Design a protein with these regions (language model features):
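Phosphate-binding and adjacent anionic-ligand microenvironments
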Residues: 170, 175-176, 212, 216-402
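Buried hydrophobic positions in well-ordered alpha/beta secondary-structure cores of metabolic enzymes
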Residues: 20, 33, 39, 65, ...
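Short beta-strand-to-turn element immediately C-terminal to the catalytic PLP-Schiff-base lysine
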Residues: 49-52, 188-192, 272-273
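Proline/glycine-rich low-complexity loops and linkers
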Residues: 2, 12-14, 67-96, 191-264, ...
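Gly/Ser/Thr-rich active-site loops/lids in small-molecule metabolic enzymes
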Residues: 56-58, 141-143, 195-214, 281-287
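Gly/Ser/Thr-rich loops at beta-strand to alpha-helix junctions
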Residues: 15, 40-41, 120-125, 184-185, ...
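N-terminal small/polar loop signature for handling phosphorylated ligands or for N-terminal nucleophile
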Residues: 1-45, 131-190
Length: 402
C-alpha cells in the first residue's frame, strides 16, 4: 500500500476491530484493514476492511476488493523487502476515553462482586479486562494468551465454547461471565449461575436499560433475523424499531442519522448512539456489567421482569444446515415460493428483506436464508415458548431438506 502512495499507520500489537474502527475516526483516516478470522476457526483467516466512517465496508466495495484480489492472485504477486519503518499508532487511550463517554463507570464500579472474562485467545485480552481493572473492578480472566489455533475450535463466544467460563463464574461466584470473540467485535454473556444468556435477550435488555437511563427517546435497529423482543421494547417505550437485512453494515446509516439508541444483531453484534457504526463486543460487555450493577439483579431475573412488562415471552432458536451442493444451489429459488400456511401455522406476513421470513398469526416466525459467509443454510425461529421455537426450526429443516 505504501508503494502505491498510501500513508500507512501501523498498530504493532493485536488490535480489536472496534478499536481499529475508532482509530480510523479519531485520526481521520481513509480506512483500515484488520487481519482476522473474526469469530471463525483459524482456517477462515482473512481481512476486514473498514471505511472512513469506521464501519464495515458496503457490499459494492468488498465485491470490488474480491475481484481485484482474484486478479492479482491469478497474475501472481511479486514481493520485495519491506522496511519496517511505518508510523506506529497506539489507539488504546483514545478508545478508552471513548468508552468513558459511553459507560457510566460511576454506576458500574458499585457492583457488589467480581466479573469473569474469557478472551477466547482473541485480541480482546488486555482491553476489556484492562479497563475494568483500571476502574478498580475485580476481574477473573481466562484464555488471554495468544493461541493462533484457538484451542483447535474457534473464538466464537457461543454457549458450547464458553464451558471454561461457566466453570470460572461458578467457582469465583462472579456476577456474570463476559466474553469477546477473536477480534472482540462480538460478545458472549453468562449469568451468575453460569447459564448462557442469548445475545437476542441481551439486546432486548440493553435496549430497555438505555431508554431508562440515557435520557434519549430514540429507536433501535435490528436485523431481520433478530428477536422481536426489540419490537416489544420499542412499543413499551413508544419508539420505532427499524428492520434491516443481515449484516452490521446496514445499521451504520441509521446510527449516523441519529435515529437509534442501539443497533444489534442476533449474532452477538451491538453498538449504541454516540459510538461506532461497527459492532463492539467490549462495549457490549461493559454495558451488561453496568446494567447488572445498576439493577442489582441477575440477568434471568431482569429478563423475566422484561417479559412481564412487555406482556409476552420471546424465545429464539438458530440452526445451521450444511447442505449438499445440489440442495444449496436450489435453495434461493425455493425461498421465492409463496405460503399461506407453513407447518400448520397460518402465515400473517411474508418478509423477503433477506431470505424468506414467515410471520405467523400468533406472533411466532421463521426465517430461512443462505449464509453470506459460509456454505450453509441458516434457520432462525422465535416463539413464546422454547419448545415451540425448536419445533419450528425442525419443521423448517424438514422443508429445506425434503
Amino acid at each position: 500500500m505504501r508503494d502505491h502512495g498510501c500513508h500507512i499507520v501501523f498498530c504493532p500489537d493485536p488490535t480489536p476491530t472496534p478499536v481499529l474502527a475508532h482509530a480510523i475516526i479519531h485520526n481521520k483516516l481513509e480506512g483500515g484493514v484488520n487481519i482476522t478470522a473474526s469469530h471463525n476457526p483459524a482456517a477462515y483467516n482473512g481481512l476486514k476492511f473498514s471505511g472512513p466512517d469506521g464501519g464495515p465496508a458496503l457490499p459494492e466495495i468488498t465485491k470490488d476488493i474480491e475481484i481485484r484480489a482474484a486478479a492479482l492472485a491469478d497474475d501472481g504477486v511479486s514481493y520485495h523487502d519491506i522496511k519496517d519503518d511505518f508510523e506506529r499508532l497506539d489507539p488504546r487511550e483514545p478508545y478508552f476515553e471513548q468508552l468513558k463517554k459511553m459507560i457510566r463507570f460511576d454506576v458500574l464500579t458499585k457492583a457488589k462482586g467480581n466479573f469473569a472474562y474469557d478472551a477466547l485467545h482473541g485480541c480482546g485480552a488486555g482491553w476489556l479486562d484492562r479497563i475494568l481493572a483500571d476502574h478498580g473492578m475485580q476481574v477473573e480472566s481466562i484464555r488471554t494468551k495468544r493461541n493462533v489455533l484457538f484451542d483447535g475450535t474457534g473464538p466464537d463466544p457461543s454457549e458450547d465454547n464458553l464451558e471454561p467460563l461457566k466453570k470460572l463464574v461458578i467457582e469465583k461466584k462472579s456476577l456474570a461471565g463476559l466474553a469477546t470473540d477473536g477480534d472482540a467485535d462480538r460478545f458472549g454473556i453468562l449469568d451468575r449461575n453460569g447459564a448462557f444468556i442469548q445475545p437476542n435477550h441481551i439486546l432486548g435488555l440493553v435496549f430497555d436499560y438505555l431508554l431508562e437511563t440515557r435520557g434519549l427517546k430514540l429507536g433501535a435497529s435490528r436485523s431481520v433475523a433478530t428477536t422481536h423482543l426489540m419490537d416489544a421494547v420499542g412499543k413499551l417505550h413508544d419508539v420505532k424499531v427499524y428492520e434491516t437485512p443481515v449484516g452490521f453494515k446496514y445499521i451504520g446509516p441509521l446510527l449516523r442519522a441519529g435515529k437509534i439508541i442501539i443497533g444489534g444483531e442476533e449474532s452477538a453484534g451491538m453498538t449504541i448512539h454516540g459510538h461506532l457504526p461497527e459492532k463492539d463486543g467490549i462495549l457490549a460487555c461493559l454495558l451488561v456489567a453496568e446494567m447488572i450493577a445498576a439493577r442489582n439483579a441477575s440477568l434471568m431475573d431482569q429478563l423475566r421482569d422484561l417479559f412481564r412488562r412487555v406482556g409476552s415471552e420471546f424465545w429464539p432458536v438458530r440452526m445451521n444446515l450444511h447442505l449438499p451442493d445440489e440442495t444449496q444451489k436450489k435453495l434461493p429459488d425455493r425461498l421465492r415460493e409463496n405460503f399461506s400456511e407453513f407447518a400448520g401455522h397460518r402465515v400473517a406476513k411474508t418478509d423477503r428483506t433477506d431470505g424468506l421470513k414467515l410471520i405467523f398469526d400468533d406472533g411466532s416466525w421463521v426465517l430461512m436464508r443462505p449464509s453470506g459467509t459460509e456454505p450453509v443454510a441458516r434457520i432462525y425461529t422465535e416463539a413464546s415458548k422454547p419448545a415451540a421455537a425448536e419445533k419450528l426450526a425442525e419443521d423448517a429443516k424438514a422443508w429445506i431438506t425434503q
